[in-house]
Amino acid sequence: MSVAFASARPRGKGEVTQQTIQKMLDENHHLIQCIMDYQSKGKTAECTQYQQILHRNLVYLATIADSNQNMQSLLPAPPTQNMNLGPGGMSQTGPSQTLHSQGNLSEALGSSLPPSSIMQGQISNGPNHVSMQQSGQTTLPTTTMSMAVSTHGSAPGYSHTVPSSQNVPMQNQGSIGNYVSRANMNMPSNPVTMMHQQATSSHYTSAQAGSQHYQGQPSIAMMNQSSQGSSMMGQRPLGPYRPSQQGSSQQYLGQEEYYSEQYGHSQGSSEAMTPQYYTDAGHGDYSYQQSSYGEQSYERTFEDSSQHYYEGGNAQYSQQQTGYQQGSGQQQAYSQQQYSNQQNYPGQQQGYVPAQGASSQYSGYQQGQGQQYASYRTSQTTSTAQQQRPYGYEQGQYGNYQQ
């Protein structure tokens, strides 16, 4: 294998041509295919050997690109930099190619290229380690990044939200604080869209001074400017976003207290109502949000309220909520609809933030939902029917309300 690598390696800079580079790219393509095959068979030793060869090839290609700036004229049109040779030149064969080529580069080329993603083969459950784009590099297009992220199939609802959120206009940045505080129950999905938006646009990437997913989280703080191994997009969301996030959790608690006063729920039951709604939005999605935010206070607020309700001893409700979590297909469909519809918010945002009528209407709907939950608590025999009914009504309400 070392001999094959040496033979593919040009002897001098003068001999480096497009054919030579293409040959090495083909070799890398073959290596990636072999790595994927061995991973599917569970042969980790062979995977490691091929990954080392692939790593050396990529390092060599990066060295060529750095040492000879004129090499861009010799390279194929799409991959003008070595990093683009990974996702741009080999993206057709599967997600692991991009992940392997990017992951190997992340060790040796942190200063020159935008490395992204730890090798997914080594971390099969680690799609959250998504590209950390450095501030100096803008060669990696957002479409390529969207490809890299959307191929992470093991993050529920994740591949759905990334493409849709890329279309969100930039104007959300200014009004995100007001929108988050007024969106009430809409907030959990909306910050995800915001973080995706920040991650997928260079404008927001430059704004994320101290962070990086949403996803890290995808996210999607996807592109971390400090090339740290923060998982998913915004392991630490940007400064102005962080207070609004904390404010949103306080807003939720305030809403819960408001619900408890309206409907005579105890604080535990009102908290349980809100986690149930979030769970409908998808613990699959929201668990991803938690890891993307990496914000202990917000995470803990959500988890504590949920656990507090579980500890309340309502076993039937806990089972029902577990059923929702297990119905990942329904969750993802609902989350996808919610996120895709939220693309309409940015255009309506400036009119929506001052529009107390719309917010009041939505709050009123949530109060009605609270009544349904209250009736569910009192008549446990029809829990399944009443549990499903507000959920189905939420989908219809979201479709009409957001469009």
Swiss-Prot record:
The keyword tRNA-binding does not apply. It comes from the Eukaryota. One of its GO terms (cellular component) is nucleus. Pfam families: SSXT. Its main location: nucleus. Residues 252-324 are annotated as: MFD domain. Residues 1-148 are annotated as: N-terminal auto-inhibitory domain. Transcriptional activator which may be required for calcium-dependent dendritic growth and branching in cortical neurons. This is Calcium-responsive transactivator. The lineage of its organism: Eukaryota, Metazoa, Chordata, Craniata, Vertebrata.
